[in-house]
Amino acid sequence: YMYNGWFFEQSATYMENVIYPESFHLRTMLANCNVVTPLTYPEHGIDYPYEIYPYRSALWQKFLVESLGDSSIVRYLWEDYGVKYASGEGVSLFPIYNDAVDSVTSGDKSLSDAYADYSIWRYFTGDRAVGGEYFNEASSYCTASTLSSHDSLFVIGSNKGSSRFISLPQEDLDLVLQTDYPDDINIYLLSVIQGNNIDIESLQPQGSSFYFSTSQGSDNVLLVNSNYSGNESVEISFSLSSGYFGLDGDINMDGSVDVLDVVSLVNQIFTGEYEPLADINNDEQIDVLDVVLLIDLILS
């Protein structure tokens, strides 16, 4: 029982609202900003087992039902769990969640997609609630916690739906997020202008870096969450800093322009990657012309 106790308590609390629609138990817990919940500590995974969190993490199952529009997903979870438990082997809930999301969406979404959406839905709670969108009781919940971008090094757990909400300056800035795990995280740049004019941009990695810009006059927030890979959970660290404005041609950012930068550029051409630092002629593509210009820079 204890191995997956978080799942049992999560389901029981969610089903209480299904059986008794007027129940305010879950809403009351999620409205409290002074306890550990998926809103006050978004960095916790969906299986965090301490501080009565499993009861409050019923928000995760509530999210799945509301976002996917199919309450049968909870039944699929329990049916699959029962079959695997009957085999006598240890049961991991994460493949079960992944299969359930895949099933109710006919393959259109994965658990990684659900984690990304869950991150967005949790951000728009409390004072940030948007009428008619996201959680139907979002305005009654605590406003999700954010971090300051002045804390340049961040950590989240992989594979389990952890999130970080990072407030950025209301300025025109070029920024870069760097990590050794670019495939294990998902990043959105969220900009809110004049109240409810919301723009959400999905950022794509360029090697181990995510480049983006913020705008003056808008609330700028970075939403970072872990993807699902099926591997054991590890700590993912990432840093946030101003965009790199070093030497032209210094592709590997080691402070000099030399043959190592040529090697890095050629590797990017072969792998199809695109990093702005390698686009020497700024034509938004990396090819032999950039190699020629880089060699000229080295020889000059």
Which residues are covered by each model-predicted region?
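Acidic/polar loop patches that form or flank catalytic/metal-binding clefts of enzymes
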Residues: 72-75
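Functionally constrained cores in energy, signaling, and assembly domains
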Residues: 1, 7-11, 161, 225, ...
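Generic preference for hydrophobic/aromatic residues in regular secondary structure cores
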Residues: 17, 26, 38-48, 97, ...
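Acidic/His/Gly-enriched intrinsically disordered linker/tail segments
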Residues: 2-67, 78-117, 122
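Cellulosome-associated attachment modules in secreted, modular CAZymes
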Residues: 243-300
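Beta/coil-rich, acidic/histidine-enriched accessory regions frequently appended to metallopeptidases
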Residues: 83-246
